[in-house]
């Protein structure tokens, strides 16, 4: 989600009046203009006193600031800004907790955020408080203690009382790789990922969000009221992706334009497809979906009950049917053949027919309104539905045929009736425990394979041992030595070993010799130990999935999601664009002491066009000013006269992506944008190559700094936006100074260079 951060433009008189009460700002530091020839020099005018910080530092490559922070004591700059030796101490205030360490300690991990505090321009790039002589970071103080200890000892441990995502976010902010976590804490660190993966398997579309999307897509329906149940979080894994696809489509249609899928001109399909799909697929999406789920559950139970009763003797009728056939012998009388047929009660067949009709209707509705037919047919539950329905229709269609082929097919279909029992798996859509069992079996595949391997090895070993142990003490007259024992060969011993190792002990086979009894005792003990090893892992998986499923069901629905407030004026993140750097002397501005015109600043990425153009009496009436014949540029409003308030001096808006889980410290984003911290995972850069960061308001001074949210962009000749790499723009001058209009042609050329046609 995008939220706006207001950044004052400081252009015009009205913009300055919008600022909150603050100490008197110091005049902006800009390099002195190039010396003019003696005949062109103007009389010196009184100006503000020089800053105690000394003359401004020269510009670095890329027109980035590299001057020291104004108002910062020289001693502090020497201590924190790069002066002094590695033995100097540094104070870091993290979330109100002060930490003190040596600068040499922070340099042990170059390229990280803390290592940037030891660089010369650290006081200007980070939030430095000259009064308290400390750097401030509004982050988690408890996690920072572990991070700082990593710099001291070289070992990164994970606190047990901190949630994994929080620790991961803090590591990303400080620029530390998570792979540096010690092996002893790695399992503790990644526990949150296991929990997130387990929750994703139970993840479902938000019932409220789905209903809102459906309501926005069309008219309200009384039978589709939004009433999320207590168990609105569970879905079967086979159809979860289909549900997400459907609700994504619903959300896209609901948020579309008025004439699109979500507006009044939307099609009937886009309006009703998500609703009908949720009606038959997600029992927690609405009250009507609950009724459909209850009906489906009722017919499933009736179908299974009917299937079981068909095998009971009380519902089976044996009938003898006599069929007269022509004798194969010519001239012989017809023969009467009596066939014995087994039939079930007719009412059971009628009940099964009603159930099949419901299952057919449900299957057709689900496959018709499914957002992805391919994914639908890949689902195991949907395959079971289709296979359980087809035999009934084939049996009804072939029942009237008397050919031998038809009877063979009918016999096969009666055998295939057992597929109907698989409908019991459809209950997983309605019961959390069954879904938990399914997820547990899938998550414990490795443990099951390990258990099978252990059992296979034990069965092979003990079956061989019992075969030869029973041969000890055999009758000398018994050539095979198997007359006195049940174990006549090793394959028979496999069955005995499985029964013994699983502690079942049917008693159909048992050893009769003392050596065989000893082998049997060892087999039972080995079976207990073998099964006991992987079973706790499977039980733990079941407990984890069950607890997460219950927690997800009992988790209250969040109606109002917390969104962090945008930085306010006076906060470290409330910053202003840097004034443009000085240009080289212009060849056409060397006479009469006339100040060269400032450039027409192009709107930066994410900044409103208003406020991008300065105002003043210098403005060319046909280029920027509206009025008598004035056209203005790009549809901008006319600029005011000197005595009029400036409507363009308004706050610029910069958009920050708040959806980033680590909005304040994604190391990849910081490394790509060269923002807010030294480049992470990149070679060390000179101080001139790095963009300074706005110091916080905790220092008692006010000064314009380069905002880490802004980068310099210029339009290319073809109208596209690109980073400015050409000559630096003209310096800011006093627009109130009168001067002849000799520079107007150059101003037009400058405007044409900045503004795409």
Swiss-Prot record:
Name this polypeptide is given: Voltage-gated potassium channel KCNC3
Keywords: Cell membrane, Cell projection, Cytoplasm, Cytoskeleton, Disease variant, Glycoprotein, Ion channel, Ion transport, Membrane, Metal-binding, Methylation, Neurodegeneration, Phosphoprotein, Postsynaptic cell membrane, Potassium, Potassium channel, Potassium transport, Spinocerebellar ataxia, Synapse, Transmembrane, Transmembrane helix, Transport, Voltage-gated channel, Zinc
Domain notes: The segment S4 is probably the voltage-sensor and is characterized by a series of positively charged amino acids at every third position.
Sequence motif Selectivity filter, location on chain: 503-508
The keyword Glycoprotein appears for this protein: yes
A GO molecular-function descriptor: metal ion binding
Post-translational modification: N-glycosylated.
Disease: Spinocerebellar ataxia 13: Spinocerebellar ataxia is a clinically and genetically heterogeneous group of cerebellar disorders. Patients show progressive incoordination of gait and often poor coordination of hands, speech and eye movements, due to degeneration of the cerebellum with variable involvement of the brainstem and spinal cord. SCA13 is an autosomal dominant cerebellar ataxia (ADCA) characterized by slow progression and variable age at onset, ranging from childhood to late adulthood. Intellectual disability can be present in some patients.
InterPro entries membership: BTB/POZ_dom, Ion_trans_dom, K_chnl_volt-dep_Kv, K_chnl_volt-dep_Kv3, K_chnl_volt-dep_Kv3.3, SKP1/BTB/POZ_sf, T1-type_BTB, VG_K_chnl
Role noted for this protein: Voltage-gated potassium channel that plays an important role in the rapid repolarization of fast-firing brain neurons. The channel opens in response to the voltage difference across the membrane, forming a potassium-selective channel through which potassium ions pass in accordance with their electrochemical gradient. The channel displays rapid activation and inactivation kinetics. It plays a role in the regulation of the frequency, shape and duration of action potentials in Purkinje cells.
Bilayer-spanning residue ranges: 291-309, 351-370, 380-398, 412-434, 448-469, 518-539
Sequence ranges of Low complexity compositional bias: 41-52, 210-219
Membrane topology of the entry: Multi-pass membrane protein
Binding site for K(+): 503-506
Phenotype for residue 420 to K/A: Decreases protein abundance
Consequence of changing residue 643 to S: In SCA13; uncertain significance; no effect on channel activity
Family annotation (Pfam families): BTB_2, Ion_trans
Effect after changing residue 366 to K/A: Decreases protein abundance
Biased composition (Pro residues): 21-40, 728-743
Positions annotated with a glycan in the UniProt record: 320, 336, 483
Residue segments, region Disordered: 1-87, 210-232, 556-613, 682-746
